Each structure stands twice: as structure tokens, then as C-alpha cells.
Amino acid sequence: MNWDGLYASAFERIRDNIGKVGNVLLAYNTNIDAIKYLEREDLERRIGAAGREEVLPYSEKLPKRIESVPQLLGSILWSIRRGKAAELFVESCSTRFYMRRWGWDELRMGGQVGIMANLLGGVYGVPVIAHVPQLSRLQAELFKDGPIYVPKVEGGKLKLVHPKEFKADEENCIHYIYEFPRGFRVFDFEAPRENRFIGSADDYNTNVVIRPEFEEHFGEIAEKTELAIISGLQALTEGNYREPFETIKEHLDVLEGKGIPAHLEFAFTPDETVRKEILGVLGKFWSVGLNEVELASIMDVMGEKTLAEKLLAHDPVDPIVVTKAMLKLAEKTGVRRIHFHTYGYYLALTDYRGEFVRDALLFAALAAAAKAKLGDVRNIDDVVKAMDVPVNEKAKGVEEALTKEYGMENGIAEVNGYQLAFIPTKIVAKPKSTVGIGDTISSSAFVGEFALR
């Protein structure tokens, strides 16, 4: 197949039509990312100082949250050993102080909402309304220029302003990102691919603290909205999920009542009770986006233990197993679209049909490759600069398996009453950063679909 030709065509169509997309509501997590590029000698020294025998058990199994330095270092090792991302809440004040003293190499916009706001509003020119739990001066400065808005209430009236015009000096919400390249070695472990571990060290995003503007004026905000992307539920626990979930359910009911398609951007959620709660409200969403670790964690709470294990058994992950898991999730919840993204390929299972689903995936993959290649995408025309990045050769086996099992043609197949769309991604050999790649993929694909409708 001429995938490069399909990539070029998809980009042109979405670039020409993305201006049709109206306001996209983004909630709930925005923060500041403090990025540290790991160095072998430094990490080995820190593990030695913390006690190697104390650290290594957490590289086998992640804790639910981080309460000590050995848990932090072991969790970083867990990600390195597997080349997989993970994010955990840092509860311990002494560990937060340790991370602050360890320092960072750069500060960037963080949180799924913040990253997607800068991409959709600052790069694509799609107007967004963002939920920002704390609008510090530094947080506001990290937003790009463009149609990015936050609600502000003055004299009892709601208006939308750019974050830089909000003029508040609230707290800094900092998350620490520990990045490593493919082949990164520490002791006898080697990273099979580039990725990162995230230590969340703020109490607003992790408790999904919802701003009063969103509590009191959500109906009015929703009136101004055409699409919604919900994220940030991953740090909730059995102890703190009930209050925010009540508000979130109310928000979902409002969106559903107004016929506004909402996408849930899933993320690694350690707490089983919270995963079950998310599963319970998934039917209120149009769409959900996840990777193999996240899909396996959902299969686990659905009682599909064997399927969960199979999802993590092979690299690249078996597309037939992924499809079976997506079918089970769609049939159980009624969610209309499931977007699966992994290193090397994407799949979308939808209860509707059309090549635009595949083309939106292609646009998303090109945007992700551009972000990996350039570090920062300044405008939509920067996306096309990734056209020279090669299509993943290993995905040929994935395509062959899907063709054999489902009779896939041109990246599209009919499976059990659903359409399955497939694309191979473009792989940047030495990415400048991996932070925000997943958010770039999911928001570009979701909004890209509606640009082509």
C-alpha cells in the first residue's frame, strides 16, 4: 500500500477543513511539567544511596502511589525496563522535596488539557475552552497565543479570556517528568524504547479539584461548546474519587443532553475502584482513547484476565488481541469509538463507517511524528515536515495479520458490526521529547474526524 500517499492526502484534507471545527471544551488537568533527562551515572548513584535492595522490588511491580524515595526510583526503573510510560501521585512531602532538589532541565506546559489546548488552539487554530485548576503567572505564560480561553466570572457574568488575561496568581502545580531515550542503560536494564515516568506532585490535579467557574456555570460553558475532551481522572483513588465524580457525572449529563460528542482520554489509572467507576460512565462518552497498558487495565476490571495478559505479552502488541478487547469494551459500554494507540500502529473501532476515520488517524500520526521530530510544533504547516519520517516497517506484520483475520483493505475492515481502521505510524529514531505525544495523537484524531464530517 502507498501509505505515504494516504498520509499526504489526509493531511491536506484536514488542514483545509479544520477551520470548520467550533469550540472544544477541555477538562480537567493542566499543570507545569518539570522535565529531567535521565543520566545513567546519576541514576545509579541515587539508587545506590537509597538502597538498591529497597528500590528494585518497585521496578517489578508499581506501587499505588509514591510515599518514599525508593518507590520513586523503583517506579522510574519500571518504566525504563519496559519502555512504557507510567504516572503516579507523589504523596510524601520529603519525596517531593527530593525531586525539587534533583531539579529539572526545562519547564513546559503539562497536563493533558494544557498540552491539548496549546496544540488545538495554538497550532491548529481550533478554539478551545480549558479548565485550569490553578492559574499561576508561570502557568499562564506557558499557554501559546491563539484562540485559547478560560472562563472568568465578573459581576456574576461569565466571559471567556485568554489565560494570560485572567491575571490571577494562584499556585504552581508541578509534575516531574523523568525522560529516557531508547537504549538507555542503568545497571543491567536497557530501555527497549524511549519514554518517561511522571511523578505528580500537586494536590489540585490529583484530586481533580474543579474550579468554581465550572461548578457554577457549566451549562453556560457547554452552550458555547461543539466537542469535549475529558482527561485527568487517572490520579483519583478510592479515598477521594466520590466528590469529583459526582460533578463529572453532572457535566457528562449536560454534554449528553446537548448532544455534544465527548472523548475520554484514558491514562494509566492505578486504583482499581476508580477504573471500575470510569468503566461505569464510559457509555456517556462518544469516544475513548487508550494504549495497551491502559486497555489491559480495563480488561482486568472487566474480569477478562487472560485477555489482559495477552495484551502485554508481545511487542508489538498483537492486533487481533487488541481488536477482541476493543470489541468487548464497545459491547459492554456502548461507546461509539475506541481509539487504540501503541508504538508503531493505531486502530480505531467505530459503530459508524467511512475513510475519514482512517484519515484522521493518519493526520494524528503525522502530528505526533512532527512533535517528536521538532520538539515543538508551531503551526499546522509544521506537521507536514514529518512526511520524510519513514513509516514503521514492523507494522507490515500487523497489517498482514489484520488482512488475514478480517479481510482488511486499505486499512479498513468490517468486524462484528463495527468498522476497524488501521494505520502504521511514522517512527522518529531520536525524538526530541516524548511528553505529550499521546495527547497529540488522541486530540488530533478526534478533532480531525469532525473536521472531515
Swiss-Prot record:
EC number per UniProt: 2.7.1.-, 2.7.1.147
Biological role: Catalyzes the ADP-dependent phosphorylation of D-glucose to D-glucose 6-phosphate and glucosamine to glucosamine 6-phosphate. Involved in chitin degradation.
Native species: Thermococcus kodakarensis (strain ATCC BAA-918 / JCM 12380 / KOD1)
Chain residues that bind Mg(2+): 265, 294, 439
MF terms in GO: ADP-specific glucokinase activity; glucokinase activity; magnesium ion binding
KO phenotype (gene knockout): Disruption of the gene severely affects growth in chitin-containing media and leads to an almost complete loss of chitin-dependent hydrogen production.
Subcellular location, principal: cytoplasm
Pathway membership, UniProt: Glycan degradation; chitin degradation; Carbohydrate degradation; glycolysis
Active site: 439
Positions of the ADPK domain: 1-453
List of residues binding ADP: 291, 341-342, 428, 438
Disulfide feature: none
Protein name, as recorded: ADP-dependent glucose/glucosamine kinase
PANTHER family in UniProt: ADP-DEPENDENT GLUCOKINASE
Cofactors required: Mg(2+)
InterPro entries: ADP_PFK/GK, ADP_PFK/GK_arc, GlkA, Ribokinase-like
Top-level taxon of the source organism: Archaea
